[in-house]
Amino acid sequence: VGLGIFAYSGGPYPLSYHGLGDVAVLVFFGWVPVVTSFFILRGTIADPTLWQLATAIGLSSVNILVVNNYRDAEEDRKAGKRTLIVRMGRDFAPRFYLTCGLLSLGLLYPIYSFWGMLLMLPYIVLFSATHRHLQFAEGAELNKTLGKTARNVFFLALLIGAMLLLKG
């Protein structure tokens, strides 16, 4: 994860300045920690369920960056930071946020099916409310959206853990 932070903002080709920050978050906050933890515990990375879970967490984490880049779009543009939101326009952010959230949930459904997904209802309600807030918030109000999005990522991780325990 430390290497990811360096690659995101430093080095000869900072990913955040070239519209690749979202990919970096998916990799370094989804795939790397989840797959590494699984490998340490199980000694393999060949389980397709593992990659679905890692991608679901990663996409959920991307939404933190989406809100941050949405809030800072004008400053980023002036600084020459070509984030995905700067490249695609501010109207893209709420749609991308929704897409990441829906893909995250979609990756979980085949693993847990209907009954396991019932556990996700509170998350879906929180995610929907946060997405709605993102659509209408401006400036410093987006700091609240950022905090709610971080809460949602944490809550999703807890729910995935609960579903794993129930699945046995």
Spans of model-derived segments:
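Hydrophobic alpha-helical transmembrane segments
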Residues: 23-27, 51-55, 94-98, 117-119
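Solvent-exposed interhelical
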Residues: 58-102
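Small-residue-rich segments of transmembrane alpha-helices in multi-pass membrane proteins
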Residues: 23-38, 57, 86-90, 147-161
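Hydrophobic residues within alpha-helical transmembrane segments
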Residues: 20, 52, 99-102, 151, ...
